[in-house]
Amino acid sequence: MAAIKLGSTTLNVPRVVFGTATLGNLFVDLPDETKLEISRQWFEAGDTVVIDTAGKYGAGLALEVIGNNLRALKADPEKVIVSNKLGWKRVPLTSDEPTFEPGAWVGLKHDAVQCISYDGILECWKQGNELLGEGFTSQFLSVHDPDEYLAAATSEDDRACRMDDILGAYKALAELRDQGICQAIGVGSKDWKAIAEIDEKVKLDWVMLANSLTIYRHPQELLDFVESLHRRDVVVFNSAVFHAGYMVGGKSFDYRELDLSNADDREIADYRDRFFALCEKHSVKPAQACVEFALSPPGVASIALSSSKPERVTSNVLLANTKLPEAFWREAKELNLMARDYPFLG
């Protein structure tokens, strides 16, 4: 799997970054053997493995599993980059189920609380490395879902305080980077405008878009922002490009089920029907189209893909190296399945 230089750093990143929410028991408690095999397959994909994780994933369980699996596989730390999204800290579980994202995480033995501030983010970073365990540390660091933290504000004053918390967290991360303790800092968010707001205030090395730059949704102002990042050597990772699986046949669109009595939701369902019909006509898998589109803008270095099945790890890597016929993209434009003036395909 080919690697691309990460902005102004000396690091190279592959076309696929491996997501790890399933290792933290998102929706399913996989056997340890399955989790180990998923990790084993990462190393079949290329020379350097980039792992995207977070303290929120299973209240730290994903970090523990990653560390245990890497040691079991005798992985070379020089060939592994762990990207840890910080902002949630493991705490004892004192209720029947975790208090964060009820119903999403299965079989957890700990809870997690949000800690976004200068001191809070350092606590999350230290705990994250402790959970990874001997031999491995997080080299890419970011604040986890700052858009949601800002959206929870109850007033303009509260939002300003929350932004100060976020900027305090980034001050701490920048100090770690400047000291050479981590190699790069970034931001990931479902709301790309929150990324743009933080980008104005923080010197970032990378950003991770989620649910934002997809075949279904690619506003021109976002493409302009990605171009601006590219000019400044800020690398873009793209993620959640299937809209929570909906564009490849899943039931949920952006983590919710559609209400077909709602006109906007009917439009989404109609889009998918027309998209699937075009894919069938050209003998294209919907996932192939979603991934090639997501990687097409200059500046998008990698795509984050995750799987609960070991055998899908390799197929995910193949998705990132598949080129579809130009005729497919031209017809997608003719059918208004993508912007007619989209410059990078068709």
Role assignments for model-derived ranges:
Residues 114-137:
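An active-site-proximal structural segment forming one wall of the substrate-binding cleft
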Residues 40, 67-71, 125-130, 174:
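Generic structural signal for well-ordered alpha-helical scaffold segments
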Residues 93-104, 250-255:
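Short, flexible, mixed-charge acidic loops at enzyme active sites
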Residues 101-111, 156-159:
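A solvent-exposed, charged loop/short amphipathic helix patch at secondary-structure junctions
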Residues 19-21, 47-48, 104-109, 149-152:
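Short glycine/proline-rich turn/loop motifs
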Residues 3, 34, 126, 130, ...:
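Beta/alpha (TIM)-barrel catalytic core signal, keyed to glycine-rich beta->alpha loops juxtaposed to Asp/Glu
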Residues 21-33, 106-122:
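Active-site mouth loops of central-metabolism enzymes
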Residues 1-97:
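N-terminal binding-site loop/beta-alpha segment at the start of enzyme catalytic domains
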